[in-house]
C-alpha cells in the first residue's frame, strides 16, 4: 500500500465508504501503518481512513507517514500535540534542538512547506454524523457537550488557517490556564482549548486540567479522574474515538469511548478500529524507538 500507488484514478468518491477505519497514534511508524493496512485489507477506492492525531515523532519515518496520508482521498485527520509541535518547529518558531525529536527528515524535506500547510488545515475534532462518532486526539472535557466541543475546536482551526497563525503557534505551549472560564480571551482561551483536545488525560468535574500526570487511570491525583469518567454517554449519544494515552493500552472504562493509542512508538502495537462494526485490528511494533 505504498503512497506512490495512490493516484487520481484511485481517489474515488468516498461519500459512502464500505468501511471507515480509525487508526491510533502512528507517530512516524510507517512500516507498521502499511502492515496494518494490509491486515485490514484496506482498499482506497472503497474504504476510508481516519487518524486520531500524533501522526509524527518518536517513530523513525514521520516524513513517509505525512506523504502517504496527504496522498489519500479525504482522510479523517485530527491534530495531536506532536503534530502541533512539528508545526512550531517547521515554521521556525522554536530551535530544532529545544527537545528530542525524530522530525529531522521532515524539517529538511523539499516539500516541507507543502506538508506543513496541509497539516495545519486539519482540525482538532471530526464529527462523523453518519457513524455517530467523534474523533479527537486526547479527549473532550466534561464541561462541554459535543456541539460546544465542536464549536471550540473551530476556534483553533480558525487560528491555524488565519493570517496570524504564526503568532498563535509561537505562543501555544504552556499549561496555563488549566481551568476553563467562559470569559477567557485571546491566547489564554486558545491555549486551554488546545490543551484540552490534544494533551488532557486527567481533569476534575469542571474541566480543570492536570497536565502533569501521565499514568494509568488508578494513578489519578486527588479530585481528578480520567476525562472520560466524567462524561455522560447518554447525553453525548456518540462514540468518542481518541488516542494520546498509551498507558491505557487501548482500554477505556467508559461506555462509547474507544482508546486507540496502544504505544506503537514505544515498542508495543498499532491499532485500528472499524467504526461500523467496532472490530479492532493490531500489528506489533517493528520500529525501534529513535529517541
Curated annotation (Swiss-Prot):
Catalytic activity, as annotated? P(1),P(4)-bis(5'-adenosyl) tetraphosphate + H2O = 2 ADP + 2 H(+)
Q: Which gene encodes it?
A: apaH
Entry superkingdom = Bacteria
What Gene3D superfamilies does this protein's entry cite? 3.60.21.10
Stated role: Hydrolyzes diadenosine 5',5'''-P1,P4-tetraphosphate to yield ADP.
* GO molecular-function terms, A-Z: bis(5'-nucleosyl)-tetraphosphatase (symmetrical) activity; phosphatase activity
Q: Which EC number(s) does the record attach to this protein?
A: 3.6.1.41
Offer one example of a GO biological process linked to this entry.
RNA decapping
NCBIfam families cross-referenced by the UniProt entry: apaH (TIGR00668), PRK00166.1 (NF001204)
Listed under GO cellular component are:
cytoplasm
Family in the record: Belongs to the Ap4A hydrolase family.
CDD domains in alphabetical order: MPP_ApaH
Q: Which UniProt keywords apply?
A: Hydrolase
This chain's source organism reads: Coxiella burnetii (strain RSA 493 / Nine Mile phase I)
| Protein name, as recorded | Bis(5'-nucleosyl)-tetraphosphatase, symmetrical
Pfam families recorded for this chain? Metallophos (PF00149)
Amino acid at each position: 500500500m505504498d503512497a506512490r500507488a495512490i493516484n487520481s484514478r484511485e481517489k474515488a468518491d468516498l461519500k459512502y465508504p464500505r468501511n471507515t477505519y480509525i487508526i491510533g497514534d502512528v507517530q512516524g511508524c510507517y512500516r507498521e501503518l502499511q502492515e496494518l493496512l494490509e491486515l485490514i485489507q484496506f482498499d482506497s477506492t472503497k474504504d476510508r481512513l481516519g487518524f486520531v492525531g500524533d501522526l509524527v515523532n518518536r517513530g523513525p519515518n514521520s516524513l513517509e507517514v505525512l506523504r502517504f496520508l496527504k496522498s489519500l482521498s479525504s482522510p479523517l485527520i485530527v491534530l495531536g500535540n506532536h503534530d502541533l509541535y512539528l508545526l512550531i518547529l517547521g515554521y521556525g518558531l522554536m530551535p530544532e534542538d529545544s527537545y528530542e525529536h525524530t522530525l529531522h527528515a521532515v524539517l529538511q524535506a523539499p516539500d516541507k512547506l507543502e506538508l506543513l500547510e496541509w497539516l495545519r488545515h486539519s482540525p482538532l475534532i471530526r464529527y462523523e454524523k453518519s457513524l455517530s462518532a467523534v474523533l479527537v486526539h486526547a479527549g473532550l472535557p466534561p464541561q462541554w457537550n459535543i456541539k460546544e466541543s465542536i464549536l471550540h475546536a473551530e476556534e483553533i482551526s480558525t487560528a491555524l488557517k488565519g493570517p496570524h497563525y504564526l503568532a498563535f503557534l509561537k505562543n501555544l505551549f504552556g499549561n496555563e490556564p488549566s481551568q476553563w472560564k467562559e470569559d477567557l480571551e485571546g491566547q489564554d482561551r486558545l491555549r486551554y482549548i488546545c490543551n484540552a483536545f490534544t494533551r488532557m488525560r486527567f481533569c476534575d468535574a469542571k474541566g480543570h486540567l492536570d497536565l502533569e500526570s501521565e499514568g494509568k487511570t488508578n494513578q489519578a491525583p486527588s479530585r481528578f479522574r480520567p476525562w472520560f469518567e466524567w462524561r455522560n454517554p447518554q447525553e453525548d449519544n456518540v462514540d468518542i474515538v481518541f488516542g494520546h494515552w498509551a498507558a491505557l493500552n487501548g482500554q477505556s472504562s467508559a461506555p462509547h469511548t474507544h482508546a486507540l493509542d496502544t504505544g506503537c512508538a514505544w515498542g508495543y502495537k498499532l491499532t485500528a478500529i472499524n467504526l461500523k462494526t467496532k472490530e479492532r485490528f493490531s500489528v506489533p511494533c517493528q520500529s525501534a524507538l529513535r529517541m
